[in-house]
Amino acid sequence: MRFANGQTGNTRQILHSEASNNLGGVLLQMFAESEEAVLEFLSQRPIQTVAMAGFIRDNGMVSRHNRGTFYGYWNSKQELEGVALIGHATLFEARSVAAVKAFATLAKKWNDIHLIMAEQSSVREFLHYYSDGGQSVRHSHQQILFETGRSPRQHGEVHYLRRATVNDLHLILPVHAEMCRAESGVDPLASDSSGFRRRYARRLKQNRTYVWVEGGELKFKADVISHTPEATYLEGIWINPNISGTGKALLCLSHVVGRLLNRSQSICLLTNVTNGNAVRLYEKAGFSSQGIFESVFLAPRANALN
């Protein structure tokens, strides 16, 4: 079997099929030969899919750094209708109900999914098919997808803003771990200390984190999670409470955005709809809402703990 983008399939590779429902859909694991077609598919909605596209550009289609496996769903016309990364963080972009159902059905076979994240309507459709046999939901957050393509006004210099290095790890790691715990309910320093430290050190070596450190104290940080020519995805933005209300957080963020726009068409990020302070900060920095995402955190299966 050969698909329109050059991906080949055989009986061993076909993981899920809707042929019995006359939909003719086929779900296949993705390999390096599909990279160009997948990136083209994802680029049709660049800010919604920047995380997956960035992982592929950074790590390739198959890599332990992805912490999961990429799959593609083809319809009966051999057209790609969906791409998913299924694993620790499960992300997907689907253009049909059949693709969502295929991804959700396959995801039930995983024991260690920590997060499911996509646009809210897609996540709820995914959970409809996943709930019978999947891991239980720990909790979820609705998030605003913010985006800007304009460099914000920068009133003042920020000579103190710089790229973080591994020498900053001891300052950043506890802060980032607490952010993860507050968001997911899991403290990564308790559940996977060495892995968490190793992954964040890799990010620092990739020059993906901006910081302001003064007097041995972290004042501000922002992480570049994914980068493509079309979009850059920011996450992990943290502001020391002792600079709140000074305008310096806005100044730091504005300079980060300005620098990143030199190599990407737009900057995007997610923030919880209930985080009023963050929403106001991003709006002041020139970001505007492009939709609602949902992040669903799952509890581990009971048998995975034994």
Q: Which residues fall in each region the model found?
A:
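Acyl-donor-binding surface of acyltransferase catalytic domains
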Residues: 2-17, 75-79, 87-159, 296
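Short amphipathic alpha-helix that is part of the acyltransferase structural core
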Residues: 3-52, 151-189, 306
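Conserved beta-strand-loop-alpha-helix junction that forms the acyl-donor binding cleft
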Residues: 117-123, 241, 269-280, 295-305
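A conserved beta-strand-loop-helix scaffold within acyl/acetyltransferase catalytic domains
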Residues: 57, 86-87, 188-237
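Conserved acetyl-CoA-binding loop-helix of GNAT-fold acetyltransferases
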Residues: 97-106, 235-241, 245-261, 279-284
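Conserved GNAT acetyl-CoA-binding A-motif
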Residues: 111-119, 231, 260-271
